[in-house]
């Protein structure tokens, strides 16, 4: 059973079932609060009927002109609630919000080029690889950096689908070429 | 004002700005701050009504709302009014709905449900689910409930039609179960059956159904779920879906058949077989293996003392459970529920280093430090005094003091009004966290026991007036629910509450101010009152004794006589010997806890008496000074005996390990487990080494 709920700062005390997972980063206070301060409607969670948080989405809106877009910063689902469509629910809502009220052209996210599971999932959601950001994920001591795929999905405002391209896996850019 | 969380100050400042510079932004700030005051605990009932009214009267000055956040603010203010009419009217207004805002949508449904306007609840939920195509369980639930309340054929038909159309979605199927539960047990059974047939392969199936299933015929339900367990090839080649159905079925057995003596044996045998399954072999390293829950269930079954086919002696129970869980952990490195239990159980038997290893594997950091560090650091100064994990946990509170007020200001500036109240509460809860209070006290005690410098560790006695906030999560431990006492049973003493913190703050303050007579008396009196009037359930017996001993010391400082010192010596030694009694059978957190408190109390006693003698110089009666010297000598003797006993325990370690390995290996339950991934003898040896480390620290304390 999944209900979507807006996220508030006090929910940070309740995300343990999600954040104890090895893949989920625990950010410092400033990171979470800055998202709540700037993009409150893009930070939301899913709950089970016991009121326990089972997943959450941290999103933001950024860019200028035709680069104005929604962005998936962090999507995390508790281990017991995986493979039941929660990620889809969270991403769908971010897309909805990015279209209205943010009126963005597209949504994007960064994913490790080796993360076949996540890439496959987002492709099922209609995302495609826009470009390969070489060495985006820094390894320890600057060695073994890993590439990221910048994956995108055009929204209603992008009628001509200018925000996506074919064969993005081979379109290489450097991290400094990526807007903040 | 944001920095000090002063809501009154915020309101006054905002009001001044709004009057001096009637800008829209300052009017909004005034409304926000009035709202914050109205919902705070710093105002009287009359003030609450006043600020609510003030906020609602300012709303027209900023209409129409320019952002969804302003609309949320208006809704929050309208929530404060005595009746819900204006709130509902505003939330259901198409102009409000056009904001497409989750906060407003949530408030809308909540307000309608609270008002009992079931027609509107039904229609709103139907719009969400069917028209907007948003699959929200809360909407499903309220629509089903509204249909039942209304008893209206048209709406009931519409509900049933939608349920049938969406029965293959998880929310839809579960909504069907919920709706059936409002009808009859028979209907609930059929709906739950349908759900499990379609979704039993999902890990969450058990959690989704358990509250409904508890009302059903247990045997009938268990027979059904057992029928769902099938394997295309064999159990040893089970796929992920097949494993999930199997484990979910076992979870229902755990829930509904608590007297099954064969439960643990069956779970262990199933787990062994599943280690060769595709589900286990093909999983990513960062995925969890759901089969681990078979072991966790077996572990918690044993810990609860439920029936088993071959009994386990009490002295070996926790170690047996540790072996079960270590087996699961060795096969599945990232399973946090296993590691949390291991952290708790190792601490329970006083093997801190092993607990630390599993705790570190969880990579708990930032806000989690406040919520989860108690799993490792509860009473750490008296289990295995350790500095590094204790100090690193305190960083979050320093960060909160800076970051949260900064971001509250940002929220005012950016107009994210839906977040102000939450951020203010967040900041307050961290600032007044009882865990923070505990860690402050523990840091001082650890430093004392380890002989470290105490500069910078002073505790402000004013802190004891804090309304301590409880943020700790005790329910994340598998098998622990508000109704269960399992987590309670294996906790490191009673939960340390605000009373515990206040008592220990007073204790530390008395120690710090021991030579300043008026302050010492003031805090001693406060401690005495606390011990007499407050609920002391959060203190262990030996902690209470230690506090009472300090009060006696304070009396000695006031008026030391030969007889007084002699009486103090007698009661102190009696208490020390009582609480330091060596357990021959097995070590536990309780024994270490008692020993460390006894030694710490001895330390404080001797230091205090020495300080008094130093202050008195030659002015005091020589007989009193001599009686103090005798007292110190008696205390030292007891401490020496404690250290000697600790040494003997250490020297008997090899025998303890051999005896333990022999006993454990002969347990029938363990013989059934595939322990090829762990070395039992090495594991037990490490338990012993962990306990020995605590013994070593104890023996190295300097009185």
What does each of the following model-derived ranges do?
Chain B
Residues 71-239, 505-662, 666-669:
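Non-catalytic protein-protein interaction scaffold segments in large eukaryotic complex-forming proteins
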Residues 2-7, 36-48, 213-220, 253-266, ...:
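Short coil/turn connectors between adjacent alpha-helices in alpha-solenoid helical repeat scaffolds
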Residues 267, 273-281, 285, 349-445:
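Compact beta-rich and alpha/beta scaffold cores in large eukaryotic transport/transcription complexes
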């Amino acid at each position: 059973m999944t209900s979507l709920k807006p996220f508030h700062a006090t929910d940070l005390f309740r995300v343990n079932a999600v954040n104890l997972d090895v893949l989920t980063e625990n950010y410092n206070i400033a990171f979470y609060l800055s998202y709540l301060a700037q993009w409150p409607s893009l930070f939301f969670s899913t709950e089970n009927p016991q009121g326990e948080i089972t997943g959450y989405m941290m999103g933001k809106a950024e860019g200028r002109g035709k680069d104005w877009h929604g962005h998936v910063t962090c999507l995390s689902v508790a281990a017991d609630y995986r493979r039941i469509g929660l990620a889809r629910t969270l991403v769908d809502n971010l897309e909805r919000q990015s279209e209205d009220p943010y009126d963005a052209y597209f949504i994007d996210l960064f994913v490790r080029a080796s993360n076949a599971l996540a890439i496959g999932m987002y492709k099922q959601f209609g995302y495609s690889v826009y470009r390969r950001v070489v060495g985006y994920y820094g390894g320890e001591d600057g060695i073994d950096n890993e590439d990221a795929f910048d994956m995108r999905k055009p929204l209603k405002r992008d009628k001509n689908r200018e925000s996506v391209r074919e064969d993005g896996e081979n379109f290489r850019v450097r991290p400094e070429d990526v807007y903040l | 004002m944001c920095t000090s969380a002063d809501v009154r100050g915020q309101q006054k400042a905002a009001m001044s700005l709004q009057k001096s510079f009637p800008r829209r932004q300052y009017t909004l700030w005034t409304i926000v701050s009035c709202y914050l005051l109205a919902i705070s605990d710093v105002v009287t009932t009359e003030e609450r009504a006043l600020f609510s009214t003030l906020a609602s009267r300012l709303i027209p000055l900023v209409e129409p709302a320019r952002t969804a956040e302003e609309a949320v603010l208006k809704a929050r203010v309208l929530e404060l009014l005595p009746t819900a009419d204006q709130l509902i009217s505003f939330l259901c207004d198409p102009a409000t709905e056009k904001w497409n805002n989750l906060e407003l949508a949530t408030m809308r449904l909540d307000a309608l449900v609270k008002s009992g306007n079931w027609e509107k609840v039904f229609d709103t939920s139907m719009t969400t689910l069917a028209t907007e195509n948003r699959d929200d369980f809360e909407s499903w639930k309220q629509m089903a409930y509204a249909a039942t309340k209304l008893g209206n054929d048209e709406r009931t038909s519409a509900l049933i039609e939608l349920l049938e159309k969406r029965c293959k979605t998880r929310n839809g199927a579960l909504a069907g179960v919920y709706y059936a539960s409002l009808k009859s047990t028979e209907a609930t059974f059929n709906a739950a059956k349908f759900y499990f047939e379609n979704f039993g392969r999902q890990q969450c199936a058990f959690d989704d159904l358990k509250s409904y299933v508890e009302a059903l015929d247990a045997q009938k339900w268990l027979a059904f779920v057992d029928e769902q367990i099938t394997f295309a090839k064999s159990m040893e080649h089970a796929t992920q879906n097949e494993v999930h159905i199997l484990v979910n079925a076992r979870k229902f057995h755990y829930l509904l058949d608590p007297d099954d003596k064969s439960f643990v044996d069956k779970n262990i045998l199933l787990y062994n077989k599943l280690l060769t399954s595709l589900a286990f072999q093909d999983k990513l390293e960062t995925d969890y293996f759901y089969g681990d829950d078979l072991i966790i269930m077996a572990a918690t079954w044993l810990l609860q003392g439920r029936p088993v086919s071959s009994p386990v002696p009490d002295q070996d129970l926790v170690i047996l459970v540790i072996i079960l869980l270590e087996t699961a952990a060795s096969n599945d490195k990232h399973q946090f529920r296993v590691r949390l239990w291991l952290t708790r159980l190792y601490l329970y038997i006083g093997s801190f280093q092993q607990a630390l290893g599993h705790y570190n594997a969880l990579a708990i950091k930032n806000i989690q430090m406040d919520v989860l560090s108690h799993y490792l650091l509860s009473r750490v100064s008296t289990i295995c005094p350790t500095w590094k994990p204790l100090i690193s946990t305190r960083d979050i509170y320093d960060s909160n003091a800076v970051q949260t007020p900064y971001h509250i200001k940002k929220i005012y500036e950016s107009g994210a009004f839906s977040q102000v109240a939450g951020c203010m509460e967040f900041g307050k809860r961290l600032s007044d966290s009882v865990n923070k209070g505990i860690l402050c006290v523990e840091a001082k005690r650890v430093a004392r026991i380890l002989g470290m410098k105490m500069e910078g560790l002073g505790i402000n006695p004013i802190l004891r007036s804090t309304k301590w906030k409880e943020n700790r999560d005790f329910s994340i431990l598998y098998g622990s629910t508000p109704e269960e006492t399992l987590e309670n049973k294996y906790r490191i003493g009673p939960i340390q509450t605000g009373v515990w913190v206040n008592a220990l703050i007073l204790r530390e303050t008395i120690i710090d101010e021991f030579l300043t007579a008026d302050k010492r008396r003031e805090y001693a009196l406060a401690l005495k009152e606390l011990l007499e009037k407050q609920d002391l359930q959060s203190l262990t017996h030996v902690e209470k004794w230690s506090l009472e001993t300090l009060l006696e010391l304070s009396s000695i400082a006031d008026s030391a006589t030969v007889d007084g010192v002699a009486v103090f010596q007698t009661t102190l030694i009696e208490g020390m010997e009582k609480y330091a009694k060596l357990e021959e059978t097995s070590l536990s957190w309780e024994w270490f806890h008692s020993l460390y408190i006894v030694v710490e109390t001895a330390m404080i006693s001797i230091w205090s008496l020495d300080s008094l003698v130093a202050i008195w110089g030659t002015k005091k009666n020589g007989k009193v000074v001599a009686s103090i010297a005798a007292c110190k000598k008696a205390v030292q003797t007891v401490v020496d005996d404690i250290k000697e006993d600790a040494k003997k325990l250490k020297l008997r370690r090899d025998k303890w390990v051999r005896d333990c390995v022999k006993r454990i290996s002969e347990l029938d339950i363990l013989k059934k487990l595939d322990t090829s991934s762990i070395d039992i003898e090495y594991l037990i040896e490490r338990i012993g080494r962990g306990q020995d480390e605590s013994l070593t620290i104890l023996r190295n304390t300097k009185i």
